[in-house]
């Protein structure tokens, strides 16, 4: 006789739990829109770091490169090689896009461990790496999707869409689904790895403040760099695939 009241009570409890938010966020109200300010603030910091580094690197170029100029030339050469390997001989126009993706994600990931975000106090929530937020990673993935659609359409025109019915029209649903899963996998892989890394460090620091978290932080820096490389490599591979028309 008490089954129905118990079931209702259980459902009510589950409903209450579903309304609980994990963490707090700081928002700006601009017009009728609610803007996630934390991500914008940290993204602007990362962009400022990148632009400042570029200005310093090209401010006074030398015929015989200095250490700083050598470093940035090495980074550029690395990005060019990555783009050429994945895209092919028509890689040139895509070097800025791939380079921007790689450097923004790399610096964003490292900023979570190296920049003292905690000293900046907000009315709600706290600052963290931009890639620690799903909004950032989804935006980067959607930009990548737009890029490889543009690459395919600019080279092949409307015949680009023939790839959806090749080698047989039976694969049409699977080929369409693939274009939805690409941005999903890109965004959730990056978001999950960065969020997990920061959570592990926070937990270890709260439990054992000294010594133990340091190796984990170094491991996190390594994996953060790898995640930036994976994202940039896949973005270049998708662009190359859309231009070549093979899977």
UniProtKB/Swiss-Prot annotation:
GO cellular component, one term: chloroplast thylakoid membrane
Entry's transmembrane regions: 38-58, 95-115, 134-154, 199-219, 220-240
Record Gene3D superfamilies: ATP synthase, F0 complex, subunit A (1.20.120.220)
Record's keyword terms, sorted: ATP synthesis, CF(0), Chloroplast, Hydrogen ion transport, Ion transport, Membrane, Plastid, Thylakoid, Transmembrane, Transmembrane helix, Transport
Membrane-protein topology: Multi-pass membrane protein
UniProt key word Transcription: no
Protein's UniProt keywords contain Methyltransferase: no
Taxonomic superkingdom: Eukaryota
Similarity field: Belongs to the ATPase A chain family.
Its job: Key component of the proton channel; it plays a direct role in the translocation of protons across the membrane.
Protein name: ATP synthase subunit a, chloroplastic
Organism lineage: Eukaryota, Viridiplantae, Streptophyta, Embryophyta, Tracheophyta
Gene, per the UniProt record: atpI
């Amino acid at each position: 006789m008490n089954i129905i009241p118990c079931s209702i009570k259980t459902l009510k409890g589950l409903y209450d739990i579903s309304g609980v938010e994990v963490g707090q966020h700081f928002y700006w109200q601009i017009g009728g829109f609610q803007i996630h300010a934390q991500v914008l603030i940290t993204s602007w910091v990362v962009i400022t770091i990148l632009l400042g580094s570029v200005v310093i690197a090209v401010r006074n170029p030398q015929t015989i490169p200095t250490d700083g100029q050598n470093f940035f030339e090495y980074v550029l050469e690395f990005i060019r090689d990555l783009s050429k390997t994945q895209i092919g001989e028509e890689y040139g126009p895509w070097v800025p896009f791939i380079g921007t993706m790689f450097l923004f994600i790399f610096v964003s990931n490292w900023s979570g461990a190296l920049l003292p975000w905690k000293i900046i106090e907000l009315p709600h929530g706290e600052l963290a790496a931009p890639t620690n937020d799903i909004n950032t990673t989804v935006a980067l993935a959607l930009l990548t999707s737009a890029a490889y659609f543009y690459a395919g359409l600019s080279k092949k025109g409307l015949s680009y869409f023939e790839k959806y019915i090749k080698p047989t029209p039976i694969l049409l649903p699977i080929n369409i689904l693939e274009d939805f899963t690409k941005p999903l996998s890109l965004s959730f892989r990056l978001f999950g790895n960065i969020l997990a890394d920061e959570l592990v460090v926070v937990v270890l620091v709260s439990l054992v403040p000294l010594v133990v978290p340091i190796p984990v932080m170094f491991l996190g820096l390594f994996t953060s760099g790898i995640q930036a490389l994976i994202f940039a490599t896949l973005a270049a591979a998708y662009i190359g695939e859309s231009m070549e028309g093979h899977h």
